[in-house]
Amino acid sequence: EIMKMPGHHKLFVVGELGRHYFVSQGHEIEQNFQYTVQKPNLSRARIISETLMEQFNNGELDEVYVVYTRMENSMVSEVETVKLLPLERSAFGEDSIPANLRREAIQLYPSVESVMDNIVPNYVTGMIYGCLVEAYASEHNARMTAMKSATDSAEAIIKDLSIAYNRAR
């Protein structure tokens, strides 16, 4: 859906399967992070986020979205799209703060810009790491479900063959 929106798009892909898919669909890939989904870690998330933050801060990217597979439950995985940059207040659930809660002004030292320059990269890294972990859990769950289904089918076939064998004796 995002790729169909008007404008110029840059595609950053994590993993070989995603790269194959987008290349086969005729999409040009800006950068392919050749990491396996099997071992998501914070250092990989940091490398990805630094690349995206650098291009966003240089004005090469207007918006940054992450599309990944989120595990809804043990049977269902959903495609999830999250807007990472620019940050929006609505993403932080300010509406969920109770109205009767006392609010005070927050003073940030040495400046708001300095604090945000430290917080935003960590937030983006954390979100990307969370997406990598969620995608890994989703893939692992899909494999486990497929293996259970294959095992159940094999057991049913063995049972049927055993009955047929015993009848033939």
Describe each PLM feature range.
Residues 1-169:
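C-terminal beta-strand-loop-alpha-helix "lid" module of Rossmann-like NAD(P)-dependent dehydrogenases
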